C-alpha cells in the first residue's frame, strides 16, 4: 500500500489505525518511524484499547537514543553467508550516502572484504575501523579466513597501497566514523549479540516499533536503511517455508524514500516490493510529496495496487489526477438551447484540472483510494477523541519492553570498553572460530586454527 499527503491531512492517523488493527488481529507488525510521534501514538491507542499491556512480550520498542537501555542490533550476526551479510550492509551504506559513495571507486571492494572478514568472526561494525588501520590485528583475523579472494585483496592489494593507502581507504573510514563516534550507534551496533531478529519477528507475529525521532539525520538514515535491508533479507530467507504456511507480516515505513530504493540503491523499488510480497512481507510506504522521490521510483508508485492520496501540493495533484482521475469525452458543459445548436462538450483539460483541484483541496481526514481495478473512491475518516493515557503509562510500556529485550546502557558501555582494551586475535574471537569457505559460506573450525 502507498500513502501520500502533506502535513496535517491525516496520513499519520491512517497509519496509526491500520497498525492498530493489525496488532489487535495478532499479526506481525513492524513500524519504522523517523519522527517518533507515530510510534508513541500507536502505543497510546493500544493502551486505550487494552491491546498491548506491559506484560505482553510481543512488543519490541526500539529507540536508539535512549540512555537507560540498549537493544543490541549486530547486523553482522544475522542469517546468511558472510558475502550475503556484507552485500546487505554495503547496500545500506549506499542508501545512506548515495552521492558520496557513487564517487568512491574503492569503497565497495574495501567495505565488502572487511565486512566479510568481520561477519565470519561474528564481530561488529565498530570493529571495522580497527580492521582497516591495525595491520597486526587484521593479519590475525585473516589467518582464520579460507576465502582466497578476501585474503588476496588485503595482502596483495590493500597492504601494497603504501603511502596511497590513507587516501584510498578514506571513503570507507569516513563512513565507519559515523557509527564509531556516535554514542547511540556505537552501543546499538557494537554489541556482539543481536536481539533484533527480524526473521523471528515475522515468523512469530511480534510487534517491532522503531522510534528514530530523537536521532540526527545521518543516524536515522543509516539505522533505517540497515533495518529495511535486513527486512528484505529476512523476507527472502523465508523461502525455506512453504508459501501456504508463511505467516504474513506487515511493515509500515514512513518517509520510505530515505531507506528504500533511493538513488544509491542497487535494487529498484519494484524489485523490493515484488520480492517482499512473494515471501509474505507486506509493505506500506508513506511520505509527503513526489519531489522526495527519484524518477525511477515514480514508475513503481504507479504499479502499486492500493494507493491512498490525501491532500497534496499542486504539482503532485497534477500527476495523481492523471493516475487516478477519469474524464468523459461525452461530458456536456452547456446544453443546446435550440434545435439548430449543438451542445458544448467539456474540454478534457478542464476535466483534468477539476481532478487536480479536488486532490489539492482535500480537507483533513479525506482522501482518494485508488483500487487495483483502477477505480478511485473518496473516503472520509472519523475524528477520534483524545486518548486518556498518561505519558507515564506509555513510558512504563516502553520500559517493560526494553527490560525484556534490552541491555542496561552502562552494561553495554562496559562490554565495548572491555573489548577495546583487549588485544590479540583470541580476545575478539567468538566462542568457536568461524572461517570463510571458498564459496563465501561459514564453516566451523577447531578453536585456534
Where are these regions (language model features)?
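P-loop NTPase motor core of the ASCE superfamily
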Residues: 1, 102, 270-273, 293-435, ...
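P-loop NTPase motor domains
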Residues: 4-9, 14-281, 285, 294-297, ...
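Active-site glycine-centered loops adjacent to acidic/histidine catalytic or metal-binding residues
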Residues: 288
Amino acid at each position: 500500500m502507498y500513502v501520500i499527503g502533506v502535513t496535517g491531512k491525516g496520513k499519520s492517523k491512517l497509519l496509526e489505525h491500520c497498525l492498530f488493527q493489525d496488532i489487535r488481529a495478532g499479526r506481525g507488525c513492524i513500524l519504522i518511524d523517523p519522527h517518533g510521534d507515530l510510534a508513541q501514538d500507536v502505543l497510546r491507542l493500544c493502551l486505550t484499547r487494552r491491546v498491548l499491556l506491559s506484560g505482553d512480550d510481543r512488543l519490541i520498542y526500539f529507540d536508539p537514543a535512549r540512555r537507560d537501555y540498549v537493544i543490541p542490533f549486530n547486523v553482522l550476526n544475522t542469517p546468511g553467508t558472510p558475502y550475503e551479510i556484507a552485500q546487505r550492509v554495503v547496500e545500506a551504506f549506499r542508501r545512506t550516502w548515495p552521492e558520496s559513495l557513487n564517487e568512491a571507486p574503492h569503497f565497495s571492494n574495501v567495505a565488502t572484504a572487511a565486512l566479510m572478514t568481520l561477519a565470519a568472526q561474528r564481530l561488529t561494525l565498530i570493529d571495522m575501523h580497527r580492521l582497516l588501520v591495525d595491520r597486526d590485528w587484521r593479519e590475525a583475523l585473516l589467518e582464520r579466513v579460507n576465502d582466497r579472494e578476501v585474503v588476496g585483496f588485503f595482502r596483495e592489494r590493500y597492504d601494497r597501497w603504501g603511502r596511497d593507502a590513507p587516501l584510498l581507504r578514506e571513503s570507507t573510514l569516513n563512513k565507519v566514523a559515523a557509527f564509531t563516534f556516535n554514542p547511540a550507534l556505537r552501543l546499538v551496533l557494537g554489541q556482539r549479540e543481536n536481539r533484533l531478529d527480524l526473521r523471528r519477528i515475522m515468523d512469530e507475529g511480534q510487534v517491532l516499533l522503531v522510534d528514530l525521532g530523537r536521532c540526527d539525520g545521518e543516524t536515522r538514515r543509516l539505522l533505517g536503511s540497515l533495518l529495511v535491508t535486513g527486512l528484505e533479507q529476512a523476507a527472502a530467507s523465508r523461502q525455506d517455508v512453504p508459501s501456504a504456511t508463511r505467516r504474513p507480516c506487515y511493515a509500515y515505513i514512513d518517509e520510505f524514500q530515505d531507506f528504500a530504493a533511493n538513488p544509491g540503491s542497487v535494487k529498484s523499488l519494484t524489485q523490493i516490493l515484488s520480492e517482499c510480497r512473494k515471501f509474505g512481507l507486506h509493505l506500506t510506504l508513506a511520505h509527503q510529496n513526489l519531489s522526495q522521490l527519484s524518477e525511477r521510483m515514480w514508475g513503481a508508485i504507479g504499479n502499486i495496487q492500493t494507493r491512498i492520496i490525501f491532500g497534496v501540493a499542486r504539482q503532485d495533484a497534477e500527476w495523481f489526477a492523471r493516475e487516478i482521475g477519469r474524464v468523459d469525452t461525452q461530458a456536456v458543459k452547456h446544453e443546446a438551447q435550440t434545435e439548430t445548436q449543438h451542445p458544448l462538450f467539456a474540454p478534457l483539460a478542464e476535466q483534468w484540472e477539476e481532478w487536480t483541484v479536488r486532490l489539492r483541496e482535500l480537507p483533513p481526514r479525506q482522501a482518494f483510494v485508488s483500487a487495483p481495478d483502477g477505480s478511485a473512491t473518496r473516503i472520509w475518516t472519523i475524528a477520534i477523541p483524545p486518548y486518556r493515557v498518561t505519558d507515564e503509562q506509555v513510558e512504563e510500556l516502553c520500559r517493560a519492553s526494553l527490560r525484556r529485550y534490552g541491555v542496561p546502557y552502562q552494561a553495554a558501555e562496559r562490554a565495548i570498553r572491555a573489548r577495546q582494551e583487549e588485544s590479540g586475535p583470541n580476545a575478539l574471537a567468538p566462542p568457536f572460530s568461524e572461517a570463510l569457505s571458498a564459496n563465501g559460506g561459514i564453516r566451523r573450525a577447531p578453536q585456534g586454527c
